[in-house]
Amino acid sequence: MALYEHVFLARQDISAQQVDALVEQYKGVIEANGGKVGRIENWGLKSLTYRIKKNRKAHYALMDIDAPAAAVQEMERQMRISEDVLRYMTIAVEKHEEGPSAMMQKRDRDDRPREGGRGPREGGFGDRDRGPRPPREGGFGDRDDRPRRPREDRV
């Protein structure tokens, strides 16, 4: 049996539970045709570079598959039929990667606070506390030092 990495994009308007159900459905197709599904990763809802079938975002999912080619072809056939799947890609690999994929490592990196490891910034502009403003010259605003204009009804 050959080894594959399979990624598919599901519509933005379905829930995460429905994405998990799609993964389980396609996992069942692979197992019914004599294959095995290893690692499954749900990368979550991400923005697309361009619109696909009027969607600006999509749920991404990755599956590591060890199955005969016929099983993968059947899964891809069912994905073509499904309205919930926007795109899919299957790649034959020599061996499956151990540990989390690059996308999951990136997500872990993005969860950390952003300070750049250098601590708070000194000088410059930005979020520094400038303290209270000094009082304005001449009271509140500019209008106190001007004489009032006469109104036509007051004359």
Swiss-Prot record:
UniProt cross-references to SUPFAM superfamilies, sorted A to Z: Ribosomal protein S6
Domain of life from the UniProt record: Bacteria
GO cellular component, one term: cytosolic small ribosomal subunit
Classification via InterPro entries: Ribosomal_bS6 (IPR000529), Ribosomal_bS6_sf (IPR035980), Ribosomal_S6_plastid/chlpt (IPR020814), Transl_elong_EF1B/ribsomal_bS6 (IPR014717)
A GO MF label: small ribosomal subunit rRNA binding
Keywords: Ribonucleoprotein, Ribosomal protein, RNA-binding, rRNA-binding
Gene Ontology biological process terms from the UniProt entry: translation
Residue segments, region Disordered: 94-155
A Pfam short name: Ribosomal_S6
HAMAP family the UniProt entry points to: Ribosomal_bS6 (MF_00360)
Function according to Swiss-Prot or TrEMBL: Binds together with bS18 to 16S ribosomal RNA.
Similarity comment: family membership: Belongs to the bacterial ribosomal protein bS6 family.
Identification of the protein by name: Small ribosomal subunit protein bS6
